[in-house]
Amino acid sequence: RYYFHIARDKELDLKMDPDRDQLIGEFTSPGMDYEVLLEDLPGGSFRVFKKAPKQLKDLYDLARSEETFLVFENERYTFNQVSDLAAQLGNGLLKKFNLNQGDRVAISMRNYPEWVIAFNAITSIGCVVVSMNSLWQSEEMAFALNDSGTKVLIADEERIARYAEIRSQTSVQVVSVRTERWNEIAHSWENLIDYQPSTLGCSSQPDDLATILYTSGSTGHPKGVPSSHRKILNALLSWELDAKLNVELGYVSSNTPVNQPATLLGVPLFHATGSHAVMLASYRPQRKIVSMRKWDVEQAAFLIQREQISSFV
């Protein structure tokens, strides 16, 4: 985003900016918040952020606060509330379905708050989020569920209706969100979050798998793209560093916002832009995420005014 605006307005290629290179060296030097070191990892030696959280659960725990995190219609959730609900859900998933380290749990629904809570819960208990395209039809769902080895599917009413058509082709357990229609084939979300928060620590290591996101596919089936906790967290810090560089170089205002940073979410959470660049990247800066059931211009304008939204993705 920054590159295209700057290249157009200032005819400056960031990759060739000596001031930027110097600042990167300063910001990533020993003792700094974004200190970088070379570490031997599976596949070779890589540069990593020394002070990055070790696993996604650390990211969530460090961001706990009473600031508003999610706004959906008339519902509001603080960072604390999201993490508390995720802890309850995580324990419910472990006890109800006897999940183990590395087991796959899929999410398929609209941009409901439950999407964010489920992501937090799954990655906090050492399991892997399979982020499913909510536009997929039944056969596409069947392929991804079987390809990923998913054990549990957390889905809303529309997605469960599609799953019901291919139920015999899979062996997954289903958790229903915001519907009572499918009680005969699904466990209710409400029952799972009725569990007490788990006191078990997350067993994930930095290079353990955290997510599987599917490509859109071209002439064949979509491909599952895996990411580890370390890869995701280092990406988040690299984006933070990039934003700080642009402030330092004068490309972005350095004025402190009067209101809490707030983003109107217009992209699906099943896409990396929604789940990573917006959702996960909102924890550390305590950014509020405002979403709608579906895109509506008048509602968006109303929310921008009411929530004092400063960005739109």
At which residue positions do the language-model features occur?
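Conserved pre-ATP/AMP-binding loop-to-beta segment of ANL
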Residues: 196-214, 221, 251-262
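Adenylate-forming
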Residues: 110, 155-164, 181-182, 267, ...
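Conserved AMP-binding A3 loop
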Residues: 78-80, 210-238
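Flexible, non-catalytic linker and terminal segments flanking ANL/adenylate-forming cores
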Residues: 2-52, 73
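Conserved AMP-binding/adenylate-forming core of the ANL superfamily
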Residues: 48, 54-57, 66-120, 137-142, ...
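A short helix-loop-beta submotif of the ANL/AMP-binding
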Residues: 103-104, 110-138, 146-152, 261-262, ...
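ANL superfamily adenylate-forming
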Residues: 6, 39-41, 74, 158-207, ...
